[in-house]
Amino acid sequence: MSKQTLVLLYGGRSAEREVSVLSAESVMRAVNYDKFLVKTYFITQMGQFIRTQQFSEKPSESERLMTNETIELTQKIKPSDIYEEGAVVFPVLHGPMGEDGSIQGFLEVLRMPYIGTNVMSSSIAMDKITTKRVLESIGIPQVAYTVYIDGQDLEACLVETLARLTFPIFVKPANMGSSVGISKAQTKVELRKAIQLALTYDSRVLIEQGVVAREIEVGLLGNDKVKSTLPGEVIKDVDFYDYQAKYVDNKITMAIPADVDQSIVTEMRSYAEVAFKALGGCGLSRCDFFLTQDGQVYLNELNTMPGFTQWSMYPLLWENMGLAYPDLIEELVTLAQEIFDQRESHLI
């Protein structure tokens, strides 16, 4: 039986490219090589596509994907050269130019099935401000927030924010993930600095009320029919869950499943599934919640391409549900082909 080609796109132009490499390396080791041939392409920070490695069997633990330090520029290709009839693409890309609809639109133009949400849901979910407004409109609880857009009156924004929110306040670039560019402010001076830092990553800034809460996450899988996992909890040894804590200092542990009341589990899974459908989701996502001491649930964000390393929450949540990492990848390929066929049928 011939193997299906799985194309891994990794790296990318965003500040989250290092996470992308870690996720892609985990995927390349977990794939069932009885069924798949894996071809990998690295996207540089400048947006160049580089043909890297090909795997017909499981690579050794010491094998690493090529990155900026090891790529051969002679292997630079036109982006459209990744096309292969019958192949499915796994864009293991995080952040802007990865999970914001850009690469999804490119793959749709190429007529290649791809894992993950479509152009619309990717672009909406990537923007924290737009996501909040959509979820508010369907009654899913959100923490209080204000918004600053580059070029607006910063002083007026500070006045509005301090009238509506109390310290601590969290400031986030609207279109970044993996906690990149996020700051916690305890004073007006810190708030101003936090907004200025966020503006180095994005022109749109979300300013949120800090809440004392547990961080609970739910995995989602499916197209028209979506399944959700039991929730898992992020347990922090730090003040807040930033990029350094997540990926450098290893100060994050997880409890799977999370120790929460059944009524809360039901509420979170329902909110997650409703949010996924409201944003037009397909394939996969991870819903991140805050759970306060008095039992209030807030949906913080919906991540359309969650971290995919072997120690990431999303694959571990599904493993807890009885779906092993290799089988999860296979299911995602099936869902990608299904949504591709559906999309193509509407264009005839």
Curated annotation (Swiss-Prot):
Instruction: Give EC number(s), comma-separated.
Output: 6.3.2.4
The upper taxonomy is: Bacteria, Bacillati, Bacillota, Bacilli, Lactobacillales
Pathway(s) = Cell wall biogenesis; peptidoglycan biosynthesis
Query: What does the record give as the reaction this protein catalyses?
Result: 2 D-alanine + ATP = D-alanyl-D-alanine + ADP + phosphate + H(+)
Any single GO molecular-function term of the entry would be: metal ion binding
Q: Which UniProt keywords apply?
A: ATP-binding, Cell shape, Cell wall biogenesis/degradation, Cytoplasm, Ligase, Magnesium, Manganese, Metal-binding, Nucleotide-binding, Peptidoglycan synthesis
Record organism:
Streptococcus pyogenes serotype M6 (strain ATCC BAA-946 / MGAS10394)
Q: What top-level class of enzyme does the UniProt entry assign?
A: ligase
Cofactor dependence: Mg(2+); Mn(2+)
Stated role: Cell wall formation.
Q: Name the positions where Mg(2+) 1 binds.
A: D288, E301
Q: How is the cofactor bound?
A: Binds 2 magnesium or manganese ions per subunit.
Q: What is this protein called?
A: D-alanine--D-alanine ligase
Query: What InterPro entries does the record tag this protein with?
Result: ATP-grasp, ATP_grasp_subdomain_1, D-Ala_lig_Van_CS, D_ala_D_ala, Dala_Dala_lig_C, Dala_Dala_lig_N, PreATP-grasp_dom_sf
Residues the entry annotates as binding Mg(2+) 2: E301, N303
Task: Give a Gene Ontology cellular component term annotated to this protein.
Answer: cytosol
Q: Where in the cell is it found?
A: Cytoplasm
